[in-house]
Amino acid sequence: MALLYPNTYPLAVSNLGFQLLYRLLNDSEEIVCERFVYPQEREPFRSLESSRPLVDFPLIFGSISFEQDYAHLAAMLVAGGVAPYAADRPGKIAAGSPLVVLGGVGVFMNPEPLALFADLMVIGEAEPVLPRLLPALAALTDRRELTEIGATIPGCYVPSAYSFRYDSDGRVREISVSEGLPQQVRRVALEQSDLAAHSEILSPEAELGMYMTELGRGCSRGCRFCAAGFIYRPPRLWSADAVLDGLGQRPPEVDRVGLLGMEMADPELLDSIAGFLQVFCRPMPVRSLFPHCGQTEFPLAYLNSSLILA
């Protein structure tokens, strides 16, 4: 299968969600996943792993993080020889007429702007959905069978099975749904993680040039200007074991660590992280970056240590 990131390689390899999805897909026995990124000028549009064209793949996943990348997604499908609109693809799923599955923050924040391009959309976080979705997709031969997935797997939205009627001012008046499908597709969220998401691929082209580890998802503050604080509900902080296990995957030659989260971890976890880095990252001193601390109280001792680069 092909995994698309509709922006350049430096942004793709810096995106922790894209890296996590790449690992989850390749961990599956049903899937061999190859990446595509939006090509820069005069770059060939081929998979990064084997240099195959997009049209060779019968299954395409797209990870959409930003609204500015919507046009890039359509351009990538056209450049790869794939009909951009789902309605223009034949019913039978095959190379040249692939099944297009879209997910990511941009999708579950508002799926409708991209619904015309997608045969299937994942509304929510990938980890709870993929264990059931991937075997179902592997057995799929025709797009008409997608309604069974939409009816049985939470978080799976089949746009072609829903039709909308609008008022004159553009508001939705009525939604008609195919038989057996839910009236509303509820967003799904991971309850707890045994292993915090972390960098799977390290590249000198990545932004900030660091090994990233996720502290949790969501934020309890609910600032009205922040979409992420609302779409990643409920707010969750990963356990110390999950975060330290994620940090433990760091290659020994990497000296820059990023701890990512919309809400800072509690002091006990920060103490554990600081102790872990001091013990397991010698003799090379590790520099850590907390890009967003909100208004969380931050102990002065961390700022006085060699562990923090703010």
Residue ranges and their predicted role:
Residues Y9-A12, R42-E43, Q68-Y70, F108-P111, ...:
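Flexible loop/turn segments at secondary-structure boundaries
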Residues L20-V32, V279-C281:
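Short helix-loop-beta junction
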Residues E29-E41:
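A short beta-strand-loop structural module common to alpha/beta enzyme folds
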Residues Y38-V177:
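Glycine-rich beta-alpha loop elements in corrinoid/cobalamin-binding modules
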